[in-house]
Amino acid sequence: PVSALLHAVAVVKAGAFGIVRLVYELYGVELVQTMNLWQPLAYLAAFTILFGSFMAVFQEELKKRLAYSTMSHLSYIILGILLPGQLSTMGALLHLVNHGIMKITLFMCLGNYAEKYGVHKFKELDGVGKKMPLTTIAFTVASLGLIGMPMTAGYLTKKYLETGAKNAGEVWAVYVFYISSILSVFYLMPIVFRALFGKSEKETKGKGLEVNPLMLIPPLITAFLTLLFGILPPEPISPLKWVQYIANKVYGGY
């Protein structure tokens, strides 16, 4: 749980939140856009998105794979902040929340695999999905969310980011998001497939199926939120309401 909190929310989001404050409160959107201060950082963020996604594909250690994924998705937030326009801002702020929910689900699921069967590397996943079906369902839902499948929180995020980039005339950024999503399929879905369809040679008799309910319930809740925020985005419980309010405040004067 501590690893999930640190790697998905507490520490890694601090830098992204700092840039949000820097751009929107210290300099202001109008100054940043007028002086084109956003462009060099936007290109750097785009490079980091692709680099993190590409590196994640080749990681054997599961937590390291998610760490590179986090590097990539934090740069989604930075790029969305830097791209001109209200929709990009909404996508960035929405991803600040949604990514935390989806990524903490993935880390908690990996923690469950490690706790129950000592799984830390990709090659050790064989058959664990059949032994821990609920954990694997939660992992699958969060993975589909990060990829950007419809009816997930991740789809809503990418919809705003991509539409915002198109409206700003920065079509290159749309292709960056597309390529990253494709790479996400290659580093997340093999985990699901190997967990479900890999043949395990280890003896697990007597170990039971899932982990303690105290470790199982949290990822199921966050996986449910991944779906809920994608299916009911306009509802008051959705982060979208707060994101719209913040974006309106930021761009209200322009």
Regions found by a protein language model. Give the residues of each.
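Hydrophobic transmembrane alpha-helices and their helix-loop junctions in integral membrane proteins
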Residues: 1-193
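Cytoplasmic/organellar membrane-interface segments at the starts of transmembrane helices
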Residues: 132-135, 185-254
